[in-house]
Amino acid sequence: VRLPTEFYQRVRADLRQRLDAAEIDGVLVTHPADVAYLMGFFYAVTERPVYLWFGTTPGGDFCVVPHLDVEYAAAQQVDIDLVAYPEFPGVVSAEQHLAEALTVRGLAGARIGYTTGVSVATLDSWQQLLHGSTFEPFTGIAAMRAIKHPEEIYFHEQAAEVCDDMLRAGRALIEDAWRREQTLPTEGEIARHVITFGTEEMYRRFDHVIFTTKLAGGLVYAGPNAARPHGLPSSRRLQAGDTLILSLGAAAASRFVESERTFILGEPSDQQRRYFEVTATAQRVGTDAMRAGRTCAEANQICLDVIRDGGLGEHIRHRQGHGIGLQNHEGPWLDDGDDTVLAPGMFLSCEPGVYVPGHGGYRISDSVLVTEGAPRRLTAYPRSLEENVIA
């Protein structure tokens, strides 16, 4: 699984233009997702740093990597010069190798951009080793990643299919136990089952799997536990009458997708119907609000106002959604505090929720592509109450 060379050429040309516009000589990249985006290098993240230098001069780019990753980078057809350092912390540090590589390329006094997420300690070490250089934040890569290319959308589509199948696998596990009159599974058992299913499906579809964090994952919570939006799966066993949230994700070529559904175990009560329908309406209205030209804050308000108007505002615990890409959570953010204007090619979750302490939670999430026209859901698992009753 590797995006075509043309993709990386296009991305790098865009980045050089942004560097020129910012009047800086280059950018130091440290985040694994940014490294993967610019050079197609996916690696196991440890204490050993990886530093990518990308400059305005073609041919001068390089990546500082631990020696143990050199062959693996070559196997991924990385076409940027590698500067290997022996080990961490090393007699000569990775930062010293970086400074030397910049110096021999005549960049010791360069204007250097750095991406968000760089630690204070790392930035301080760069400044001490490169006295003549100036450093300033650079957000251009985040802006680039927010707009998905067609090659990326293809892998998001593949991940969406797997993610929907993970929901089916989780439901089937519960239904099978119920049909056989066996003990219902625990939250943890369901989580293990769907994650294993999703991971195996990725290996079945692709001959060489690459990822920045994981191939498949998920949160599973039922009954009162479902009132905690990001609670971890527990050993609690499902019971008739429970509300169950399957919050699942998958990634193809490290392009993520999430698909989340709320299920009712047995005949829904009037209370469950009300909570579910308000959530489903907010999700439908919120998805339609994700149109090019509207701000993230405006879409968020339109979505969550459905819950407030339904008399359930006190049970809101989070924003409408977030960007998805090489990370499961990335900008832009569908939140009151983000005035980013939605644009075609942006890919975000729409996941409003209602959480009632002591009772349960309700959340429906799709991964949505912003287009020139109507928003496009890539995830397609059924959303209605009738289709999500397990009986």
What are the functions of these language-model segments?
Residues 1-391:
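Active-site neighborhoods and metal-handling regions in enzymes and metal-associated proteins
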